[in-house]
């Protein structure tokens, strides 16, 4: 039975039993703090935790999942893969164990011609929680499973919880016995290679308390009991297709076979080290798994990058390419492998075929970039490994960091290649350097917003009274104070000077969302209370929390108040938000539909827009985008908003934000019909002419494959243009030209003169250094048996000038042991170059060691070949100390 038949059979079975079929959610998780969807129940977490009310009581899905925690084990076992599909059936307060268990048994054991999977019931085993007698009785008495094939397990094995106070409950797992050749008899408790888990049924029936691990108190039963089950599609396919592991199933095997053909190697199916072809088989399995995972991630909008999801995708693609190189394939391989994965997956996920042009372009570009990285980085890594071997030490964290930071060489590849060469890597030092880099970046990041109330308190409020948003149609709303929170705790009142959070029954204030900044304004009561609204957030969907300062009087829960939005700020913010839609449409006109939105932020007069694009925009493209945007403003397109079902909006081609979660009903914002049609819950101007003007002020990279533009609208745009006009007038006067049209030619001529002057100055400095070489060689000092020149050249033109001086000095010092160590400062950075001759090397002196000693003193690092090396630092005042450190090392090594 093919994989697409398995998934269709699953959905049909549960749909016939009144389950709502829910399409797979994106691999990009909507849960805070999670990068990927890692289980079938993840999209339903808000329902299980009571954060949202489910629109149905029964549901079923086949969910795409990604897990990369055990990425290093991929290919080595039959169980580890990064992409997998989890089929699940779910009940939200409807049926429970007495229906879930018989349905699972029926679907697994019913003959295929009758709609089931046809597994041999004599080969099925189950485990239950040792305290769950109800499940045991259902399996034994209702289903008829013999007692010897029902095993009771402890809390560690058969009890589910979220890891924190909340829902919990026992689970029951179903296993398939693959037979005695896979391991010993005795059931799942004895051997998990022979008895493979295929389905887990979780019974959420209790409320757990505080505690670590599985050591917590059960507080009582939940008022609504839920069912969450998950069946591994790949594992079931493995059994139904009679293959040894999931790599050999119909959705994965074609890539494995293509890798074997491309490399000229034979796939043996070896699963243990030492078996024939094991190493090659592992590499082919890595390729098959990672290519499929990459295909699915790119299809869901992920692009390669250096952080987060992008880094995971980049690592998967590069590990696949690296594995092919170890199989002897040095040319690009993804153009052969990726289409195989597409063809294997399109039966279940048609989007991989429909969007393959974009998917392949991203994947192939990443492979080309990685091959260049390998070419440049491998040479440097091999040299660093050679030096480390010669000095009988690990590859330093600094070397690994330099490869990663400067050349884009991933640390996992450094670890693999170093291990192959028999050298370890100081990974602790590397991680420390990475942490320092992240810390520096975080110091510049915006401070986090103040903490809001505990989520459980907010959910209680949502159940009691949500917040009706009136701000689409009005900016002033009579309303009632429903709650006041101080430090996350409900309080009955707040007085002048206090900073609190307020929940209103109805509110015109827009809560920050979708890239749009929150409204600000005031809340007043007839009793004289005045509240200044500084921020509005929705920590729980449907409940707006206003962060306020009580400016005067006292506000009480239950007070009748008037909420007023700052109309000027709102209008200017709406203009910026509408501007992001205009920019998005203009980008599509110029760059094509692949310029997909990756994020945005807008506030009064300013907008920032991130989009997918592989290269910097040129001046002509920027000008064209700006012109299209301002033409749309001139043409005064009406901004139309409509609410409709999500399916209808998608049929109309409405664009959605990558990674955003939408309900069944959505709001669509249009400008000039299909020219700009987006799903959007934000507020907007009535027509594009209300933007006034739009000026693009910057364009930059925000990670591999993504760009960012910033723009000003309205009065901010006019002020920007006025400032540029003033600057042009100033330059016209300074450069003594008649009009601004002459500026480019005059500036080019001035810069040419400056470059020529700098070239002449650099030449003079180089001549001066060379003229000094003879005298420096004659004044050389003796450090033990070594003739040494330890000289600070002061201000220099470049590191090349310093290197030339060191090599010249080494030649002049003759054939006796000699060291030339020279320092200088270029562009405010201290540099050091050391050159040693063969006799000095025979005496145990290495240029790289001497440079590292000096560079460490200067607050930096360096390296190079044993005969010549260079480095640098950050503290030029330490140059005398650096030269003294070299002198001491020469004395201690050769003296």
From Swiss-Prot:
Keywords: Aminoacyl-tRNA synthetase, ATP-binding, Cytoplasm, Ligase, Metal-binding, Nucleotide-binding, Protein biosynthesis, RNA-binding, tRNA-binding, Zinc. This is Alanine--tRNA ligase. Pfam families: DHHA1, tRNA-synt_2c, tRNA_SAD. It is an enzyme of class 6 (ligase). Its EC number is 6.1.1.7. It comes from the Bacteria. Binds 1 zinc ion per subunit. Its main location: cytoplasm. It catalyses: tRNA(Ala) + L-alanine + ATP = L-alanyl-tRNA(Ala) + AMP + diphosphate. One of its GO terms (cellular component) is cytosol. The keyword Phosphoprotein does not apply. Belongs to the class-II aminoacyl-tRNA synthetase family. Catalyzes the attachment of alanine to tRNA(Ala) in a two-step reaction: alanine is first activated by ATP to form Ala-AMP and then transferred to the acceptor end of tRNA(Ala). Also edits incorrectly charged Ser-tRNA(Ala) and Gly-tRNA(Ala) via its editing domain. Its cofactor is Zn(2+).
């Amino acid at each position: 039975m093919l994989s697409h038949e398995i998934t269709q059979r699953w959905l049909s079975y549960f749909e016939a039993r009144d389950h709502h079929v829910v399409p797979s959610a994106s691999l990009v998780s909507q849960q805070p703090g999670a990068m990927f969807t890692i289980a079938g129940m993840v999209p339903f977490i808000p329902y299980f935790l009571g954060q949202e009310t489910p629109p149905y009581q029964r549901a079923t899905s086949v969910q795409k999942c990604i897990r990369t925690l055990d990425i290093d084990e991929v290919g080595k076992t039959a169980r580890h893969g990064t992409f997998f599909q989890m089929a699940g059936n779910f009940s939200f307060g409807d049926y429970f164990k007495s229906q879930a268990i018989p349905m699972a048994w029926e679907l697994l054991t019913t003959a295929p011609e009758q709609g089931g999977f046809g597994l041999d019931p004599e080969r099925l085993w189950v485990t239950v929680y040792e305290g769950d007698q109800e499940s045991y009785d259902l399996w034994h008495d209702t289903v008829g499973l013999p007692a010897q094939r029902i095993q009771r397990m402890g809390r560690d094995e058969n009890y589910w919880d979220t890891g924190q106070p909340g829902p919990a409950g026992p689970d029951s797992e179903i296993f398939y016995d693959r037979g005695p050749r896979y391991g010993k008899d005795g059931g799942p408790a004895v051997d998990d290679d022979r008895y493979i888990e295929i389905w887990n049924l979780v019974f959420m029936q209790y409320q757990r308390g505080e505690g670590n691990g599985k050591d917590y108190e059960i507080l009582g039963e939940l008022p609504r009991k839920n069912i969450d089950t998950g069946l591994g599609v790949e594992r079931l396919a493995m059994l139904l297709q009679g293959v040894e592991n999931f790599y050999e199933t119909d959705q994965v095997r074609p890539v494995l076979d293509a890798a074997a053909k491309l490399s000229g190697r034979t796939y043996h199916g070896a699963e243990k080290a030492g078996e024939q072809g094991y190493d090659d088989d592992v590499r082919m399995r890595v390729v098959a798994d990672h290519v499929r995972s990459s295909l699915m991630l790119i299809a869901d909008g992920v692009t390669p990058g250096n952080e987060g999801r992008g880094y995971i995708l980049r690592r998967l693609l590069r590990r696949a390419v690296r594995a092919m190189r170890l199989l002897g394939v040095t040319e690009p391989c993804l153009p052969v492998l990726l289409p195989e994965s597409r063809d294997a997956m399109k039966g279940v996920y048609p989007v991989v075929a429909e969007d393959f042009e974009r998917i392949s372009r991203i994947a192939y570009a990443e492979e080309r970039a990685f091959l260049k990285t390998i070419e440049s980085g491998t040479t440097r890594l091999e040299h660093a490994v050679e030096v480390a071997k010669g000095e009988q030490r690990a590859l330093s964290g600094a070397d690994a960091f330099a490869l990663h930071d400067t050349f884009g060489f991933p640390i996992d590849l450094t670890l693999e290649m170093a291990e192959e060469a028999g050298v370890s890597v100081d990974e602790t030092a590397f991680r420390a350097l990475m942490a320092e880099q992240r810390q520096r970046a975080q110091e510049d990041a915006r401070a986090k917003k103040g903490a809001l109330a505990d989520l459980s308190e907010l959910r209680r409020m949502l159940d009691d009274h949500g917040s009706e948003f009136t701000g689409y149609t009005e900016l002033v709303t009579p309303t009632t104070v429903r709650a006041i929170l101080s430090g996350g705790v409900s309080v009955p009142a707040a007085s002048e000077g206090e900073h609190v959070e307020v929940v209103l029954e109805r509110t015109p204030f827009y809560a920050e969302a979708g890239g749009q900044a929150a409204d600000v304004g005031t809340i007043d009561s007839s009793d004289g209370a005045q509240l200044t609204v500084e921020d509005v957030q929705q920590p729980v969907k449907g409940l707006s929390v206003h962060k306020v300062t009580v400016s005067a009087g006292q506000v009480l829960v239950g007070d009748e108040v008037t909420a007023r939005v700052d109309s000027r700020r709102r209008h200017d913010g709406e203009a910026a938000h509408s501007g992001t839609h205009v920019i998005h449409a203009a980008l599509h006109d110029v760059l094509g539909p692949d310029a997909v939105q990756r994020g945005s932020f807008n506030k009064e007069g300013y907008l920032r827009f991130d989009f997918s694009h592989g290269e910097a925009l040129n001046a002509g493209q920027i000008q064209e985008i700006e012109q299209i945007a301002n033409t749309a403003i001139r043409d005064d397109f009406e901004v139309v908003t409509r609410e409709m079902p999500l399916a209808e909006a998608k049929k109309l081609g409405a664009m959605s934000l990558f990674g955003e979660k939408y309900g069944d009903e959505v709001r669509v914002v249009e400008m000039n019909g299909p020219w700009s049609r987006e799903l959007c819950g934000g507020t907007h101007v009535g027509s594009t002419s209300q933007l006034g003007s739009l000026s693009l002020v910057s364009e930059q990279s925000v990670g591999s494959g993504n760009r960012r533009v910033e723009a000003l609208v309205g009065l901010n745009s006019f002020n920007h243009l006025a400032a540029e006009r003033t600057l042009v007038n100033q330059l016209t006067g300074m450069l003594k030209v008649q009009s601004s049209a002459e500026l480019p030619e005059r500036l080019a001529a001035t810069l040419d003169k400056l470059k020529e002057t700098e070239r002449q100055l650099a030449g003079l400095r180089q001549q001066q250094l060379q003229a000094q070489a003879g005298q420096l060689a004659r004044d050389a000092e003796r450090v033990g048996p070594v003739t040494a020149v330890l000289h600070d050249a002061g201000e220099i033109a470049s590191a090349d000038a310093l290197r030339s001086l060191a090599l010249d000095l080494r030649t002049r010092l003759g054939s006796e042991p000699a060291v030339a160590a020279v320092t200088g400062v270029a562009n405010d950075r201290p540099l050091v170059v050391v050159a040693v001759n063969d006799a000095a090397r025979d005496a145990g002196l290495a240029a790289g060691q001497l440079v590292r000693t000096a560079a460490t003193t200067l607050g930096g690092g360096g390296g190079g070949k044993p005969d010549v090396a260079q480095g640098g630092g950050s503290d030029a005042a330490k140059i005398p100390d650096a030269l003294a450190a070299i002198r001491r090392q020469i004395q201690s090594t050769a003296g």
